[in-house]
Swiss-Prot record:
ATP binds at residues 232-234, 241, 495, 547-550. Residues 210-213 are annotated as: Aspartate. The keyword ATP-binding applies. L-aspartate binds at residues 186, 232, 465, 502. Its EC number is 6.1.1.23. InterPro entries: Aa-tRNA-synt_II (IPR004364), aa-tRNA-synth_II (IPR006195), aa-tRNA-synth_II/BPL/LPL (IPR045864), Asp-tRNA-ligase_1 (IPR004524), Asp-tRNA-ligase_1_N (IPR047089), Asp/Asn-tRNA-synth_IIb (IPR002312), AspRS_core (IPR047090), GAD-like_sf (IPR004115). The lineage of its organism: Bacteria, Bacillati, Cyanobacteriota, Cyanophyceae, Synechococcales. One of its GO terms (molecular function) is aspartate-tRNA ligase activity. It is found in: Cytoplasm. This is Aspartate--tRNA(Asp/Asn) ligase. It comes from Synechococcus sp. (strain JA-2-3B'a(2-13)) (Cyanobacteria bacterium Yellowstone B-Prime). Coiled coil: none annotated. Aspartyl-tRNA synthetase with relaxed tRNA specificity since it is able to aspartylate not only its cognate tRNA(Asp) but also tRNA(Asn). Reaction proceeds in two steps: L-aspartate is first activated by ATP to form Asp-AMP and then transferred to the acceptor end of tRNA(Asp/Asn). It catalyses: tRNA(Asx) + L-aspartate + ATP = L-aspartyl-tRNA(Asx) + AMP + diphosphate. GO terms for cellular component: cytoplasm.
Length: 601
């Protein structure tokens, strides 16, 4: 065996070197970020996760390291031992925390050279221009970049802040729940795992720890939390992954007010600890009905105005046939006021074929009527213009608070269609017209969701959140139209967390299962263990779960959760680094009693 190599221990990380260390001999380890040769003196930028420090190799002052310094290249892994010196004042670098010092490299050792051409530059602005597929293929290089390293460290600090708050200040207990569990009928598609020991039977990977955390409340754990891995086999978007992480919490003997208050303090603690931002409390609240009526969304971005205005009353008995028909059929008419929109938005974009027309029709709207507010008149299409009386024109201006130069865009039809189409249009135009202040932080709670929504394809009700959400006590007489004791936390138009009080009485849980179309036999087969647990003394309880990836993404100012996950999947649910998913050997399938029916091409 070769003799063991003894190297000096690291005394500092690269980004920690400061003027206080001047005159000290230090040993650092890291990667060569950049090499520069200035008049025979070689400067090396040494990088690790903490930052960058400048090394100096001088043929007179550091003759031992100088020859090797001329040979190293970007991304070589090296050890350096040297003396910390102050930089000449005219060479201070204010962009670096270490910018007032440099290290004269008295010893330099290459621990690992780069044997191949780098697929992309890890440092500098060039690194930001690399296609994402290449970055994901060489993720271990991508994660060396300052931005990505910063994101991973931010994620760590968020989790650290969560643990310290929940454990040290609130008495929560961290409990791991099973990854191999059983498939349930609600929610997205499950990832299934065949059981070799029990042929013909399957595990499912958990979409959330929902049932287990409720059982922990039955068990008397009282306050539970977990940084939980979850899995959903669904179509992917920029903010979705097949496997993701959530902060999962459950609490016994707390009402909704107590849960929201505790969670506001948690979020404020995270912002203060991680970003140094003090958030005002309490957070604003809107009911689901208010949010849909005013913003056309159950996760409204309240950083800007442009609230929807219901003008149905103005068109009662209207001679404009389109609106009259909508009202006769029980629909409504709303306006999206666009400040300054008269000049900024052309008729071409609003009429059939235009991009705004296409946007609203994508969500079920029949089209976009409009009014342009001019100094002395309202300008619109002929039929609508002819139907408006002076009193109606005045009432429209009063309701919308419109001023000359504004544009009024109409939505007419069923409430759900009008709200969603105008809500989407509101966000689109708010971004396009620069009405959304980028640095604003608006957090609010949405409460009183409906218990159920109708699934037209399956001709049945389904739980809007999940079937374990407790109905509002005032609505128990008619569960199908009941409000849920559910709440979502929305940050700048993005849902970052959601939870509810839970059902803890067997008879109510059975009624909810029946409402979503489960027979008593199906309910017992799928959830008999939960129903039985409710017979043994169950505390009132509730909880919440946060999408940790999404929360960190917003804190980091990123646009995709892939940029805050170490090894993410693509939007095709593939890992470009490892090649997963992949085919497996026939022997493995045989052991699992599984056969593939897939025929390529």
């Amino acid at each position: 065996m070769p003799a063991a190599i003894h190297r000096p221990a690291r005394t500092l990380y690269c980004g920690e070197v400061r003027p206080a260390h001047i005159g000290q001999t230090v040993t650092l380890y890291g990667w060569i970020d950049r090499r520069r040769d200035h008049g025979g003196v070689i400067f090396l930028d040494l990088r690790d996760r903490s930052g960058i420090v400048q090394l100096v190799a001088d043929p007179q002052k550091t003759p031992q390291s100088y020859p090797l310094a001329g040979e190293v290249r970007n991304e070589y892994v090296v050890r350096v031992t040297g003396t910390v010196q102050q930089r000449p004042p005219d060479s201070f670098n204010p962009r670096l925390a270490t910018g007032e010092v440099e290290i004269y490299a008295e010893q330099l050792e290459v621990l690992s050279p780069v044997g191949k051409q780098l697929p992309f530059s890890v440092s500098g602005e060039e690194a930001e221009e690399v296609r994402e597929e290449i970055r994901l293929r060489y993720r271990y290089l991508d994660l060396r970049r300052e931005r990505m390293s910063r994101n991973l460290q931010l994620r760590h600090r968020v989790i650290q802040a969560i643990r310290r708050f929940l454990e040290d200040e609130e008495g929560f207990v961290e409990v791991e729940t099973p990854i191999l569990t059983r498939s349930t009928p609600e929610g997205a598609r499950d990832y299934l795992v065949p059981s070799r020991v029990n042929p013909g039977e399957w595990f499912a990977l958990p979409q959330s720890p929902q049932l287990f955390k409720q059982l922990l409340m039955v068990a008397g754990v009282d306050r539970y939390y977990q940084i939980a891995r979850c899995f959903r086999d669904e179509d992917l978007r920029a903010d979705r992954q097949p496997e993701f992480t959530q902060l999962d919490m459950e609490m016994s003997f707390m009402d909704q007010e107590g849960i929201l208050e505790l969670n506001e303090r948690l979020i404020c603690h995270i912002f203060k600890t991680v970003k140094g931002i003090h958030l005002p409390r309490p957070f604003p609240r809107l009911t689901y009905a208010e949010a849909m009526a005013r913003y056309g969304s159950d996760k409204p971005d309240t950083r800007f105005g442009m609230e929807l205005v219901d003008v149905s009353e103005v068109f009662q008995g209207s001679r404009f046939k389109v609106f009259a028909k909508v009202l006769a059929e029980g629909g409504l008419i709303k306006i999206l006021p666009v400040p300054g929109g008269d000049e900024k938005i052309s008729n071409t974009r609003i009429k059939p074929g235009g991009d705004l027309f296409k946007l609203v029709t994508q969500y079920g709207a029949g089209g976009l009527a409009f009014i342009r507010v001019r100094p002395d008149s309202l300008d619109t299409i002929g039929a609508l213009k002819e139907s408006l009386s002076p009193e109606q024109e005045k009432r429209l201006l009063d309701l919308t608070q419109a001023k000359p130069g504004d544009l009024l865009l109409f939505g007419a039809g069923p409430a759900a269609v009008v709200n969603e189409s105008l809500g989407r249009l509101r966000l689109h135009l708010g971004q396009e017209l620069g009405l959304i202040p980028e640095n604003a932080l608006n957090l609010l709670w949405i409460t009183d969701f409906p218990m159920f929504e109708f699934n037209a394809e399956e001709n049945r009700l389904e739980a809007l959140h999940h079937p374990f959400t407790a109905p509002h006590p005032d609505d128990l007489a008619d569960l199908k139209t009941a409000r849920a004791q559910a709440y979502d936390l929305v940050w700048n138009g993005v849902e970052v967390g959601g939870g509810s009080l839970r059902i803890y009485q067997r008879e109510i849980q059975e009624q909810v299962f029946q409402a979503i179309g489960l027979t008593p036999e199906q309910a017992r087969d799928k959830f008999g263990f939960l129903l039985e647990a409710f017979e043994y003394g169950t505390p009132p309880h509730g909880g919440i779960a946060y999408g940790l990836d999404r929360l960190v993404m917003l804190l980091a100012g990123e646009d995709s959760i892939r940029d805050v996950i170490a090894f993410p999947k693509t939007q095709q649910a593939r890992c470009l680094l490892t090649g997963a998913p992949s085919s497996v050997e026939a022997k493995q399938l045989k052991e699992l009693h599984v056969a593939s029916t897939y025929q390529p091409g």
